[in-house]
């Protein structure tokens, strides 16, 4: 019986699944929004949320744990300098999963995964005066 085995295998070996989720975690923390399939997004949430919780308390032990899970120094620095303090008062629920239709090739359900309360990036739009 598979009772209480909530892990999604995603049709991968355990090492492939671990590497894929690690890479997706690094990409999400780097870009703060990624597009992936819905099952991968739901499994990614189980990995990313505890790592962001580590980032809220910048002790040496937590930094070592985060590096052990992420294996990217720049992302660990960003986690403890920017992302952790941003969610200091939020008790969990750092991600938003938005369904965005189906992939063209195989009709897989797709989703955007984004960090909540991320800074809005607006591009400067030049306005040309009609008088010129």
Curated annotation (Swiss-Prot):
<dbReference type="InterPro" id="IPR036373">
    <property type="entry name" value="Ribosomal_bL17_sf"/>
</dbReference>
<dbReference type="Pfam" id="PF01196">
    <property type="entry name" value="Ribosomal_L17"/>
</dbReference>
<comment type="similarity">
    <text>Belongs to the bacterial ribosomal protein bL17 family.</text>
</comment>
<dbReference type="InterPro" id="IPR000456">
    <property type="entry name" value="Ribosomal_bL17"/>
</dbReference>
<dbReference type="InterPro" id="IPR047859">
    <property type="entry name" value="Ribosomal_bL17_CS"/>
</dbReference>
<keyword id="KW-0689">Ribosomal protein</keyword>
<dbReference type="GO" id="GO:0022625">
    <property type="term" value="C:cytosolic large ribosomal subunit"/>
</dbReference>
<protein>
    <recommendedName>
        <fullName>Large ribosomal subunit protein bL17</fullName>
    </recommendedName>
</protein>
<dbReference type="GO" id="GO:0003735">
    <property type="term" value="F:structural constituent of ribosome"/>
</dbReference>
<keyword id="KW-0687">Ribonucleoprotein</keyword>
<dbReference type="GO" id="GO:0006412">
    <property type="term" value="P:translation"/>
</dbReference>
<comment type="subunit">
    <text>Part of the 50S ribosomal subunit. Contacts protein L32.</text>
</comment>
